[in-house]
Amino acid sequence: MRKKILATTAMAAAAVLGLSACSGGDDATAEGSGELQIEVPDIAMQEELGDYEGEVNIVAWSGFVEAEWSDAFTDETGCVVNRRVAGTSDEMVQLMRTGDYDLVSASGDASLRLIAGGDVQPLNLELIPNFGDDIVEGMKGQIYDTINGKSYGIPIGRGANILQYNSEIVTEEPTSWDVAWEKDSPYAGQVIAYDAPIYIADAAVYLMAHEPELGIENPYALDEKQLAAAIDLLKQQNEIVSEYWSDPAAQITSFAGGTTVLGTSWEVLRKLTEDDKFKSVLPEEGSTGWSDAWMLATESKNPNCAYAWMDYASTPEVNGAIAMNFGMAPANAAFCETSEEAKAHCDYFHATDEEYFEKVWFWTTPIEQCIDGRSAEEATCTNFQQWTDAWLSVKG
């Protein structure tokens, strides 16, 4: 089964602590501008392509690199694709630091760690012609992979963390996350929640709508007071939660077996239940979500094959094949027009519905620089280590 589990280890936390604010924090902007200014290693961008080296070594989520399309890539380029499947973002970060891999399909909770650690290099988009107009705008220049005006990631796909429910018990579609957060929920004791420090952001999204006096503008930019409020809410939720999940298979089993009535999910997990009684909704408060991108190792031994792969994997056909195999919205919107099956997939995962994804706050590693626009003089935000420590207190 597919996993995207934010790691909680000290190594991951230490990596994030390397992210520090530049002077002039007023230059930092929020989601999607590509104007976040932080201190990162000054790594040169590749200027032109050379001869293919004969192989490319990729760390990827299960389902992203399969023989169905990688064999054709090898036939076209002579670059043999060597795949290593990773189960967590932390594992991906650690593997990329071994120097053995050229590419990684990083999620937003790993990308800033890799950029700040000097593990990945900025990309020359002119060498990736398929990164063009057909790539959905909502996946270009995002804060989690575009730093100081430089692009570090080529988008693959995205998804929202939605509210899933058993419609035989929850007979009216919920409009709010309150049924999963408030202690007077009629479904107390039958609620499932995600098990990772990044889930703190879900609490922050809820607080943005219900306690605006806290001043939360970005769920990944929490000062100490705001983090404390999120933890208080999570501890309240803990009293009504029957189960936490990090293994997607366990989440599906919990719903199918009747232990869980509602809670956090992904659209693909609802689909995999193969039971129409399970419905999903993106509540009025919005939600968190995830977005994956190809990132190139700074010390890549096979950069030309790696660039060729990023371009190849960005074609409508291959990007769409990855999206369908994994269960997510593709980055290349042109895929949606290739067949009726493709259109149905895109409709199911809201591939080109930017109004839908405008309500989604994609996973971003929390850092001390407040990425909501507050300057260093105005506030210091909490980092990943602090989130990790705080999360450990939630479940007791």
Name what the model sees in each region.
Residues 297-366:
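Mature extracytoplasmic/periplasmic domains
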